[in-house]
Amino acid sequence: MRTATQHIYHNRFQEAFPELNTSNEVREIQQFLISKGYNLGHWGADGDLGRMTKQAIYNYITAQSNGENSIPTNPTIPANNTLIEEFKAIFRRKNYIFLNENLQLNIIGIRNLDANADFFDDELVVIWKENNINNVKRYPVTTDPGKGYLQNVMINPKGTAILKAGQYRNAYKLGLHRGQYLALVQRNGPVTVYRDNNKNGSLDFMTGSTDTGFFGINIHKAGANSTNVNKWSAGCQVFKREVDFNEFINLCKKSESTLGAGTKFTYTLLEKRGVAIL
């Protein structure tokens, strides 16, 4: 049986990593990379050969080839208080509000600006204070529509919606997503989206026309642990894993029970290039 290092080198020139066909092999490599200090995000050793794992493998091989003794090129995840202070600084620069009262949730999407669609390669960060203690949760999500809509079906004749980065104050509330289950729904205020209508399957950030209004850009879930976005998102912000979404919604319910029925939630979408801490 190959060691994790041998698996990495065996797949050095195989972009698709075809030999790594079991989650146990992938998990073994992930554990090895984490032990060397590589940042796989909060996904950790989940057995899923995602983009962060592939990037970490590439970085490890590059470091070895350059004689760098496998020094990781990805930064480690900062401690909660450091992360919170960095977000506060970003919000101040952008004139965004940062919520500091008990159980007021700062819900923050971090968009990876890779134009390749159909991956859960973005992140949703929740920061809040509870009983004077700071808390942070981080979840894998997509902030972009999937190829099922980008290439095939346009719900709006103007094009598929891609939520524009910005802060949407009090635009969300707890409600039913498509009448099926509790989610955060965009019913309290307008949002601005780009319209991508060329059906080329790539995400056209900042190149299309913009559209502002009520489009049902909800925050909801995909499947139990989805790999591809496909038709899970037509512009919504969508959790990769159901268990993460359930935890998030329970937190929103707890917030509402403290702040009062009909609590309004603010959603802030940032672009990763402007968030050096992640």
What are these regions (language model features)?
Residues 3-8, 31-34, 220-226:
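Short amphipathic alpha-helical segments, especially helix-boundary/capping motifs
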Residues 240-241:
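Cell-envelope and extracellular/periplasmic
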Residues 1-3, 51, 190:
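A detector of low-complexity, intrinsically disordered, Ser/Thr/Gly/Pro/Ala-rich segments
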Residues 9-74:
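Short acidic, glycine/serine/threonine-rich helix-capping segments at coil-helix boundaries
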Residues 2-12, 16-20, 75-78, 82, ...:
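Long terminal regulatory regions of eukaryotic proteins
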Residues 69-230, 244-265, 271-274, 278:
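Cell wall/extracellular polymer interaction/catalysis modules
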